[in-house]
Amino acid sequence: MSVSIKPLEDRIVVRPLEAEQTTASGLVIPDSAQEKPQEGEVVAIGPGRFDDNGNRVPVDVAVGDVVIYSKYGGTEVKTGGNEYLVLSARDVLAIVVK
């Protein structure tokens, strides 16, 4: 998937994954009652930030990784009819290993 957003420094562009629409017992959860997703697929990464010595520190995730991120982190962006979240690398809590 090609994204028209090029993140800077240690920023990451994530496509949020859809939240479950039903409960385990089969009840449908309306959009107004659903929590924001905290899991998404990385679609673009920045080159990394510079440390105090001027060395570039690479980002720990790669394009295609599924990550769990901070609930209130990032900035929501819409482009090309799709919704994305631009996060700082510090807002990523974990990589989901399947």
Curated annotation (Swiss-Prot):
- CC per GO annotation: cytoplasm
Which cell locations does it reside in? Cytoplasm
Does the record bear Cytoplasm in its keywords? yes
A Gene Ontology molecular function term for this protein is:
unfolded protein binding
PROSITE patterns in the record, alphabetically? CHAPERONINS_CPN10
Q: Which GO terms describe its biological process?
A: chaperone cofactor-dependent protein refolding
Stored CDD domains: cpn10
Primary localization class, coarse: cytoplasm
UniProt keyword terms in alphabetical order: Chaperone, Cytoplasm
What is the superkingdom listed in this entry's lineage? Answer: Bacteria
PANTHER family assigned: 10 KDA HEAT SHOCK PROTEIN, CO-CHAPERONIN GROES
Describe its partners and assembly state: Heptamer of 7 subunits arranged in a ring. Interacts with the chaperonin GroEL.
Q: Please describe what this protein does.
A: Together with the chaperonin GroEL, plays an essential role in assisting protein folding. The GroEL-GroES system forms a nano-cage that allows encapsulation of the non-native substrate proteins and provides a physical environment optimized to promote and accelerate protein folding. GroES binds to the apical surface of the GroEL ring, thereby capping the opening of the GroEL channel.
Q: In which family does this protein belong, per the annotation?
A: Belongs to the GroES chaperonin family.
User: What is the protein's given name?
Assistant: Co-chaperonin GroES
The record lists the organism as: Paenarthrobacter aurescens (strain TC1)
